[in-house]
Curated annotation (Swiss-Prot):
Keyword terms, alphabetized: Repeat, Ubl conjugation pathway, WD repeat
Protein name per its UniProtKB record: WD repeat-containing protein 48 homolog
Function recorded in the entry: Regulatory component of the Usp12-46 deubiquitylase complex. activates deubiquitination by increasing the catalytic turnover without increasing the affinity of deubiquitinating enzymes for the substrate. The complex deubiquitylates the wg/wingless-signaling receptor arr/arrow, which stabilizes the receptor and increases its concentration at the cell surface; this enhances the sensitivity of cells to wg/wingless-signal stimulation.
UniProt xrefs under InterPro entries: G-protein_beta_WD-40_rep, WD40/YVTN_repeat-like_dom_sf, WD40_repeat_CS, WD40_repeat_dom_sf, WD40_rpt, WDR48, WDR48/Bun107
GO biological process: double-strand break repair via homologous recombination
Placement of WD repeats on the sequence: 13-52, 59-98, 101-140, 152-191, 194-233, 236-275, 278-317, 359-398
UniProt xrefs under PROSITE patterns: WD_REPEATS_1, WD_REPEATS_2, WD_REPEATS_REGION
Signal peptide: none
Length: 670
């Protein structure tokens, strides 16, 4: 499959939920892993008047589920639904290498700081251990890496944790259990049962003797690894617990939940708990700010917020339950907040105290492909409607907060063009998928006059294939090595542009910043690059290895996709009393032929009339039973109306619907 994303050249704002956070306390950089497939880097110490955005790290093509900073903040490891683990230069923001060991979504990472070891796990039930120093030393020539694997998990893994010394690794899964291994030997230590739903979050104590778990069952549990049992159950949430953060001494847990609430609780005395804040959406991840006076939180929404943190020695003043709410007159430490006493900004009553907010962008939630199969309307999470040109890979117009359904009705045409692409909104940006299986990307043949009116030349009406034109535009900068076939005499075969000099198409170009993704039918990512990067030597060689033949046929060999033929019958309407209504004329034509061509056929071949412009008529009409009076009337019509277009002289009906109702450029398939 080939897919591409319609987006801006630089996307400075998350366009969907944010799955994970990492803070570099040395330089104050905050890393956020987005469901829009982009990792962004922010200055977490910015003031409200400064732009927090630093850069984007782009190489994934699906949700980034987890990230870990390692090597003192020099490198970052990421895990994604595109089934890959990637190694990044965190400071410069480029991808150093890609690990393709997993066979399904990679959901979680764990990091042993003292050993510089990272573990990855996901829906394929596998856990792989990676030596970070080995990963960061990989090059184009030195690209072989060995890994240890931990087996035994019977279900998909959603959470993973290690202690800094790397003596314990814990996984949580849809088995509703915690499995514990020694990563040094890959031997199983224990299996802990107690949760009733998926285990979504884990934290291991520094000494490796305890682990805290959060589950979709809404419970937080403290486990003793030595005793292999649960020693505390905390119930402060009404829905699943998806994020956990521990204080340095492992005495208090900060939990984020599907119920949108973030709560701090003392592990040994759960009655000492306080509601830090209530977010706008279910909480996905948590991390401390640079001085640990607040916590950064992410949710299903695209904003990243920092909330004022309570002091642990004041927790005994509170007793929070899932039905409690914040006293809107007090700060996070139990004292009143005024503008002179704190920089924190009170949010709406009962919602907590927001210290900072990194604003996100809107995610596209709805789309409708118009009947012309070129344009589509979208509606985003802020209720804004926009129109996109899929063929030219760009947004055409922001329509604002208008009636979405009315815009669809207003812009729909009575025309039929076959489906030739599918749309995926998983990342919050429109991803267009071209393939050869369920939806054939070469199915849409149209006349240039109807499909590309802005490029059609007067007097000519060539037929164009949308999928072919788009693939040629997407790979315009790719110049693969020349083929090894030659004509007799040693002269290179230049036919069909095989020398690579003929690239792109004659009608349009697409934005150079457009990401193109080549993937297997099952969705596994094979190659990702920008349109402009296809000219690079490395990228060109990679494309030569990965681009499927059905793409190279139209892009390089310039093979024309086959026309789709449509059989149909012509039958005289009952109102034509003198016409032989029992006789049908069976015809076959390309499905994209315009119905005015059928009118011309009827006028010339069936009725024997002249075409506009002096074209001679046939003396034997397709009707076959014309009598002399009919011929006389046709002769009169010829002399008086030979300059009138055929579609104005012939009325075509299909299922009793007049073709005039659809416009003069209606196609036969419509």
């Amino acid at each position: 499959m080939v897919s591409f994303v319609i987006r801006d050249a630089e996307e400075k704002r998350h366009r969907n939920g944010v799955n994970a956070l990492q803070l570099d306390p040395v330089n104050g950089r905050l890393y956020s892993a987005g469901r829009d497939a982009i990792i962004r880097v922010w200055n977490s110490t910015q003031t409200s008047s400064q732009e927090p955005y630093i850069q984007s790290m782009e190489h994934h093509n699906d949700w980034v589920n987890d990230i870990v900073l390692c090597c003192g903040g020099r490198n970052l490891i990421s895990a994604s639904c595109d089934t890959t683990v990637k190694v990044w230069n965190a400071h410069k923001g480029f991808c150093m290498s890609t690990l393709r060991t997993h066979r399904d979504y990679v959901q979680a990472l764990a990091y042993a700081k003292d050993r510089e070891q990272v573990a990855s796990a996901g829906l394929d039930k596998a856990i792989f251990l990676w030596d970070v120093n080995t990963l960061t030393a990989l090059t184009a020539s030195n690209n072989t890496v060995t890994t240890s694997s931990i087996t035994g998990s019977k279900d998909s893994i959603y959470s993973l944790a290690m202690n800094p010394s790397g003596t314990i690794i814990v996984s949580g899964s849809t088995e509703n259990t915690l499995r514990i291994w020694d990563p040094r030997t890959c031997n199983k230590i224990a299996k802990l049962k107690g949760h009733t739903e998926n285990v979504k979050a884990l934290v291991v104590s520094e000494d490796g003797t305890q682990v805290v778990s959060g589950s979709s069952d809404g419970k937080i549990k403290l486990w003793s690894i030595g005793q292999q049992r649960c020693i505390q159950t905390i119930s402060v949430h009404s829905e699943g617990v998806w994020a956990l953060l521990m204080t340095d001494n492992f005495s208090h847990v900060i939990s984020g939940s599907r119920d949108k609430k973030i709560v701090m609780t003392e592990l040994r005395n759960p009655t000492n708990s306080v509601l830090i804040c209530e977010e706008r959406a279910p909480v996905l991840s948590l991390c401390y700010n640079i001085d640990q006076t607040g916590i950064w939180a992410t949710t299903w929404n695209s904003d990243v917020r920092c909330w004022k943190l309570n002091k642990t020695d004041k927790l005994s003043n509170y007793s929070y339950s899932s039905n409690s709410s914040i006293n809107s007159g007090g700060g996070g430490d139990g004292t009143p907040v005024t503008n002179s006493a704190s920089n924190a900004t009170p949010a709406s009553a009962g919602k907590g105290y927001e210290v900072a907010c990194i604003k996100g962008g809107a995610a596209i939630k709805k789309y409708h492909v118009l009947n012309d199969k070129r344009f589509m309307l979208t509606k985003d999470s802020e209720q804004n409607v926009a129109i996109y040109d899929v063929l030219k890979v760009k947004k055409v117009e922001d329509l604002g907060k208008v009636d979405y359904e009315e815009e669809i009705k207003k812009r729909s045409q009575r025309v039929h063009v076959p489906n030739w692409f599918t749309v995926d909104l998983k990342t919050g940006m429109p991803t267009i998928v071209l393939g050869q299986d369920e939806v054939d990307c070469f199915a849409a043949w149209v006349s240039a006059e109807a499909g590309l009116p802005e490029h059609a030349e007067s007097g000519s009406d060539p037929k164009v294939n949308y999928g072919s034109l788009l693939l040629q535009a997407l790979l315009e900068y790719w110049k693969p090595p020349p083929p090894h076939h030659h004509l007799q005499g040693g002269v290179p075969d230049m036919e069909n542009g095989c020398d690579g000099d003929i690239r792109g198409n004659e009608y349009f170009i697409v934005p150079k910043h457009t990401p193109i993704i080549f993937s297997e039918v099952g969705g596994r990512n094979v190659c990702r690059l920008l349109v402009k990067d296809a000219a690079g030597e490395t990228e060109s060689a990679l494309l030569s290895e990965t681009v499927p033949s059905w793409v190279t046929n139209v892009v390089i060999e310039r093979t024309i996709p086959k026309f789709i033929k449509l059989p149909f019958y012509l039958l005289a309407h009952p109102s034509m009393l003198k016409q032989d209504r029992s006789k049908k004329e069976r015809l076959i034509a390309n499905e994209f032929i315009q119905c005015r061509k059928v009118c011309e056929h009827v006028l010339e071949k069936v009725l024997g009339a002249d075409l506009p412009g002096g074209g001679g008529g046939s003396s034997t009409g397709g009707g076959g039973n014309s009598n002399s009076s009919q011929n006389n009337s046709q002769s009169d019509a010829n002399s008086e109306g030979s300059q009138v277009p055929a579609e104005e002289r012939i009325e075509l009906l299909c299922n009793d619907v007049n073709n005039e109702d659809y416009g003069k450029n209606i196609h036969l398939n419509t």
